[in-house]
Amino acid sequence: MNSPTTATAATSAPVTAVDPKSFTRFAEFYPYYLGEHRNPACRRLHFVGSTLALVCLGMLVATGRPYWLLVGLLCGYGFAWLGHFGFEKNKPASFKRPLYSFMGDWVMYKDIWTGKIPF
């Protein structure tokens, strides 16, 4: 009789639960962050949300109207959370490590632009 571990190992790699709070350095956290963004649709939604957030930041600077900050945050987080809940089927790491997740989003954004991570 197969144990749950054996059955899981036979069909796919076992999933190990990692608490994002356990990381003490961003360099340790980033590989975990990328693992939470395996689905291309999730990455694309992050990319679109980050791009729109940058546009909103530009509008904030150009117009001086503070509501662009709110719109930028809604775009950035809204698209990312849609990717996680709709496609990746996981909870965003920003719920447990908000600063590292924010940093990870911008590093991933750069990595997509430079071709290090597929769009």
Model-assigned labels for residue ranges:
Residues 69-74:
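Hydrophobic alpha-helical transmembrane segments
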Residues 57-60, 83, 112:
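Structural signal for membrane-spanning alpha-helices in multi-pass inner-membrane proteins
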Residues 1-18:
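Short, non-transmembrane cytosolic segments of multipass membrane proteins
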Residues 45-58:
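Core segments of transmembrane alpha-helices
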Residues 35-46:
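Short, amphipathic, aromatic/basic-enriched membrane-interface segments that mark the entry/exit
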Residues 60-68:
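Transmembrane helix interruption/hinge and helix-loop junction motifs
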Residues 13-33, 89-119:
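Membrane-proximal soluble regions of multi-pass membrane proteins
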Residues 75-88:
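Transmembrane alpha-helical segments that form the membrane-embedded catalytic/substrate-channel core
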